[in-house]
C-alpha cells in the first residue's frame, strides 16, 4: 500500500488530500474547519480530517507532497520583476522581505508544522515538492481510469513552466 498526503498551504485555499494506491481516499479544505474564506494557513484541521478518514497517522505515510517548489516560484517572480523594471519596483520592495524571511524556506516551516502535528513524525525525507502545474495535472490524471492522457492546466500563477 502506497499512501500519499498532498498539502496545499501558505497561498490561498489551504487543503489536504490522502491518496492510497492511486485512489483519492479523502480531501478537505482548511476553510471548512476554520470558517476563514480562502484560508492560507497550514491545513492542520484538514490534515487531521483526511488522516482520521484514512485511519492513518503522519508517521504511517509513505510520502508527503507540497503543491509547489518555492525556489522555482521565487525565480519566476524575480524574472517578472526584472522584465518590467522599473515599473514594479515598489511591489518588488514589498514582496522581497516576505519571500526572504518566510516563503523561500517553506521546507523548514513545513517540517516544523509536521513535527508539531505528530510527535512521532521524524522522517523529513518523506517530504517532496512538486511543480505547481504538475500538481494540478497529477490530481486529474492519477485518479482517472486512463493509462495515458493529455492534461491541460490553466490557472493564475505557478513557477512559469507554461507557455
Annotate each predicted stretch with a short phrase.
Residues 1-163:
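Short acidic/glycine-rich loops and adjacent helix/strand connectors
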Amino acid at each position: 500500500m502506497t499512501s500519499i498526503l498532498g498539502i496545499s498551504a501558505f497561498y490561498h485555499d489551504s487543503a489536504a488530500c490522502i491518496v492510497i494506491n492511486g485512489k483519492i481516499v479523502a480531501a478537505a479544505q482548511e476553510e471548512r474547519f476554520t470558517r476563514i474564506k480562502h484560508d492560507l494557513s497550514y491545513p492542520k484541521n484538514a490534515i487531521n480530517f483526511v488522516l482520521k478518514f484514512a485511519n492513518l497517522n503522519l508517521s504511517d505515510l509513505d510520502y508527503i507532497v507540497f503543491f509547489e517548489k518555492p525556489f522555482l516560484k521565487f525565480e519566476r517572480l524575480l524574472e517578472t520583476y526584472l522584465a518590467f523594471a522599473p515599473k514594479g519596483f515598489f511591489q518588488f520592495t514589498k514582496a522581497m522581505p516576505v519571500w526572504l524571511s518566510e516563503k523561500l524556506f517553506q521546507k523548514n516551516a513545513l517540517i516544523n508544522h509536521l513535527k508539531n502535528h505528530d510527535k512521532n513524525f521524524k522522517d523529513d525525507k518523506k517530504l517532496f515538492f512538486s511543480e505547481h502545474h504538475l500538481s494540478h495535472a497529477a490530481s486529474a490524471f492519477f485518479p482517472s481510469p486512463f493509462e495515458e492522457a493529455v492534461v491541460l492546466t490553466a490557472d493564475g500563477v505557478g513557477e512559469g513552466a507554461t507557455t
